[in-house]
Amino acid sequence: MSRYRGPRFKKIRRLGALPGLTSKKPRSASDLRNQSRSGKRSQYRIRLEEKQKLRFHYGLTERQLLRYVRIAGKANGSTGQVLLQLLEMRLDNILFRLGMASTIPGARQLVNHGHILVNGRLVDIPSYRCKPRDIITTKDKQGSRALIQNHMDSSSNAELPKHLTLHSFQYKGVVNQIIDSKWVGLKVNELLIVEYYSRQT
């Protein structure tokens, strides 16, 4: 299953705010209530919608998300929390959380087009897993810096999560530590997502 490229507002009306996909939000709570009036949601549908929130927010294909779930399941600790940490530490998401891109798809384009360095080396893989003490910068070119500046000028003044530091005048971000679960950028019930996949196998 490929990445979603359809109307973004259609997804946030069904699933709620997806800041990684779009800065738009449902116009009112009634947008979400209207979706639920078609009937009582089954437990399967509730789990499915939580999974879809995660997939659309981070811009993943179904296959990619399943791979992350399997990696998280083999790691020490809570599978759901490890899953969120893996997704939050992706390079495209780190750029988004730093405010260097307005959405995760926008961050993915910056990486794909060769504008981003990690520890001084060009990285063109959006799924690159960032680690504590990684330093993320833009290429020292006017075009690259102009793109980042435009994003930073237009980005909402969201509170920067504690695991990141932004030096905006240097177009530089620093990963201080692995993200704590309370700083994850999406309201989602990760346990329902783990349950969804456990019932598919």
Swiss-Prot record:
Entry's Gene Ontology cellular component terms: chloroplast; small ribosomal subunit
Sequence segments annotated as region (Disordered): 16-43
Keyword Plastid attached: yes
A UniProt-annotated Pfam family: S4
Subcellular localization, as worded in the UniProt entry: Plastid, Chloroplast
Domain S4 RNA-binding: 89-169
MF GO annotations: rRNA binding; structural constituent of ribosome
GO biological process, one term: ribosomal small subunit biogenesis
Highest taxon of the lineage: Eukaryota
InterPro entries from the UniProt entry: Ribosomal_uS4, Ribosomal_uS4_bac-type, Ribosomal_uS4_CS, Ribosomal_uS4_N, S4_RNA-bd, S4_RNA-bd_sf
Keywords: Chloroplast, Plastid, Ribonucleoprotein, Ribosomal protein, RNA-binding, rRNA-binding
CDD domains noted in UniProt: S4
Subunit structure: Part of the 30S ribosomal subunit. Contacts protein S5. The interaction surface between S4 and S5 is involved in control of translational fidelity.
Function summary: One of the primary rRNA binding proteins, it binds directly to 16S rRNA where it nucleates assembly of the body of the 30S subunit. With S5 and S12 plays an important role in translational accuracy.
Similarity comment text for this entry: Belongs to the universal ribosomal protein uS4 family.
Name of the protein in its database record: Small ribosomal subunit protein uS4c
Organism: Nymphaea alba (White water-lily)
Phylogenetic classification of the source organism: Eukaryota, Viridiplantae, Streptophyta, Embryophyta, Tracheophyta
